[in-house]
Amino acid sequence: MPHFSRPFAREVGLLAAAMKESVIAKAMPRKRTLIPSPLAWSPTAVPVAPPLLPVVAERGGTQLRTPLPVAIIDTREQNPLSFRRFRKWFADIEERALSLGDYSVRGMEDSCVVERKDLADLIQSFTTNRNVFINRLRRMSECPHSLLVVTASLSDIKSAYPYRAANPNRITQSLIAVLAGLRVPFICTETHELGEEIVASYLYQTFLYDWLDRNGHGRHLSDGDL
């Protein structure tokens, strides 16, 4: 019987164990995932049409009859989100001056505040008008429902600007500071149209949750869910 050195025998044993595990792994059926890996998704993104309503509330499987909010657009907003595509989400759409923010809901002007910025306005707000903007954000942080919406992608915000006075890193990190320091959430949308849908849905849902809470239904859309 041939004699092998201990190191060689150990390597042979490890190789045999690895081959055994490989055979077992191949014999076991693989579980199919319901959602494929994001790497397999198409890189071409085409947003689908918005829903008839963002969400509905139900209790015991029966949809509740809930009122629609009245959206408010600040009259000083430049290139405003008109919400024309989402008129069925609101009882009415008003244009009048707001003391804070660009968008709100009637009856919740002091508790629901949405500030919108396109890329150029965001850069100017974090540079030339930084003190004014930070003070506005501090006031927003005191509101129960506040949201900063940027109608530009994070890639655009992080990319080089045509003017050297503004630093993409400083703008990006200022956004993170707004979230971490002031606890004001922000969301970036690639287009003006997507921003319009996000803001419209936020106003609708903020009003709906508030109505459910005030009328003894609790802050959830359906039993055991959001």
Positions of the model-derived regions?
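Non-catalytic C-terminal interaction segments of nucleic acid-processing enzymes
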Residues: V23-D110, D121-L226
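Conserved catalytic cores of phosphodiester-cleaving nucleases, focusing on short active-site segments
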Residues: C112-D118
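Residue-level detector of structural "landmarks"
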Residues: A9-R10, L15-M19
